From Swiss-Prot:
Family: Belongs to the tetrahydrofolate dehydrogenase/cyclohydrolase family.
One GO term (biological process): L-histidine biosynthetic process
Protein name: Bifunctional protein FolD
Catalyzed reactions: (6R)-5,10-methylene-5,6,7,8-tetrahydrofolate + NADP(+) = (6R)-5,10-methenyltetrahydrofolate + NADPH; (6R)-5,10-methenyltetrahydrofolate + H2O = (6R)-10-formyltetrahydrofolate + H(+)
Residues that bind NADP(+): 165-167, 190, 231
Subunit structure: Homodimer.
Organism of origin: Prochlorococcus marinus (strain NATL2A)
Keywords, sorted A to Z: Amino-acid biosynthesis, Histidine biosynthesis, Hydrolase, Methionine biosynthesis, Multifunctional enzyme, NADP, One-carbon metabolism, Oxidoreductase, Purine biosynthesis
């Protein structure tokens, strides 16, 4: 039987560590960590994700400075809001919820966030720190994947890793983190020819392509470890329609095809998703400890 990499359980364990770090530092810090999540417009998926993050803040005692901004906000207006949060001493982390409306310059806005308050690890300076192996905020989803692998004692060093997807949000930083852990890494993408022949060579396969059910039985080798980063809502099939069931969650991987073949896999939901939110909290608490002159007791949680 394959090992199921339970991100929900691990996220709860790490949240407890973060909560304890906050409580032990309050006497010196005189304030709780602060996280500002900026949501622009009314994208339903973004609303769900922001709600998850606010609930997570409540659970561990992080103060939320969330802002829900109008769809047609200008680049200048949003930049000014970010600048004011950069100056706000009670805010330790800033996250710009992506995707943004098409009229906004994502790169310019990410650059406007203080790198020291970059809770999502996407500022160019922090991506550069990742390349150089220097400490700093880390991209949340790849950091969550690394934690999931480490806590389940899955060896990375010397392994052949294939990352499907090359986004700045997941694919590229994921490849860098695996390389730093001494894996031999290949990145596949939408222009890769004969994807199955490449992915079958992987000891560790991380799929972040954003395409439901892209990877199936013919893409994986025996005893491979598969990490499914994707999450999608599929319309109910005919059987579910009769039962009036809602849409169905799935990932980029056909788990039902591969589960008897692989050594371990992350489920959807309950795998990478909870870890992404927890690493956002870890980045924020780490920044809070730094800003308040506290011992950096949780930095080991970040790759």
């Amino acid at each position: 039987m394959p090992k199921i990499l339970d991100g929900k359980k691990l996220a709860q364990e790490i949240e407890l560590i973060l909560q304890q770090a906050i409580e032990s530092g309050l006497e010196v810090a005189k304030r709780r960590p602060g996280l500002a999540v900026l949501r622009v417009g009314d994208d339903p998926a973004s609303g769900v994700y922001v709600n998850y993050k606010e609930k997570a803040c409540d659970r561990i005692g992080v103060r939320s400075f969330a802002k829900h901004l109008k769809e047609d906000i200008s680049l200048e207006e949003l930049t000014e809001i970010i600048k004011s949060l950069n100056e706000e001493k009670n805010v330790d982390g800033i996250l710009l919820q992506l995707p943004l409306p098409s009229h906004l310059d994502e790169t310019a806005l990410l650059r406007s966030i203080d790198p020291d308050k970059d809770a999502d690890g996407l500022h160019p300076l922090n991506l550069g720190r990742l390349i150089k192996g220097e400490k700093g905020p880390r991209s949340c989803t790849p950091a969550g994947v690394m934690s999931l692998l480490e806590r389940n004692q899955i060896k990375i060093e010397g392994k052949r890793a294939v990352v499907v997807g090359r986004s700045i949000l997941v694919g590229k930083p994921m490849a860098l983190m695996l390389e730093a852990a001494n894996a031999t890494v290949t990145i596949a993408h939408s222009k890769t020819k004969d994807l199955p022949s490449l992915t079958k060579e992987a000891d560790l396969l991380v799929v972040a392509a954003g395409k439901p059910y892209l990877i199936g039985e013919n893409h994986v080798s025996e005893n491979c470890v598969v990490i499914d980063v994707g999450i999608h809502r599929l319309p109910p099939d005919e059987e579910n329609m009769k039962e009036l069931k809602k849409t169905k969650l799935c990932g980029d991987v056909k788990i039902f095809e591969i589960e008897d073949k692989v050594a371990a896999y992350s489920p959807v939901p309950g795998g990478v998703g909870p870890m992404t939110v927890t690493m956002l909290l870890a980045n924020t608490v780490d920044r809070w400890q730094k800003h308040c002159g506290l011992p950096l007791t949780i930095s080991h949680l970040l790759p």
